[in-house]
């Protein structure tokens, strides 16, 4: 087998390996992003916490919780702090 054919086969093998590895990492990232609730989404204290340590507000009975920024965070974002 010529050296050019070997080089092409090696290159195809490396590209295939890198593509599979990159796809596995991407699926891990999306799975971890799904495991937390974004701002103004429904959350749960134990099963689905808020992303980025955003605080949550629950109903009086604790049956409905939602990720919301507090007043200080909202003012800080408005001012740009």
UniProtKB/Swiss-Prot annotation:
It is found in: Secreted. Gene3D superfamilies: 4.10.40.10. It comes from the Eukaryota. Coiled coil: none annotated. Disulfide bonds join 36-51, 50-67, 58-65. The presence of a 'disulfide through disulfide knot' structurally defines this protein as a knottin. This is U17-lycotoxin-Ls1a. It comes from Lycosa singoriensis.
């Amino acid at each position: 087998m010529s050296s050019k054919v070997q080089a092409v086969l090696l290159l195809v093998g490396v590209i295939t390996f890198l593509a599979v590895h990159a796809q596995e990492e991407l699926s891990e990232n999306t799975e971890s992003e799904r495991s937390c609730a974004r701002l103004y989404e429904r959350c749960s204290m134990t099963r689905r916490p808020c992303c980025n340590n955003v605080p949550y507000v629950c109903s009086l009975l604790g049956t409905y919780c939602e990720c919301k920024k507090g007043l200080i965070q909202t003012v800080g974002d408005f001012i740009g702090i």
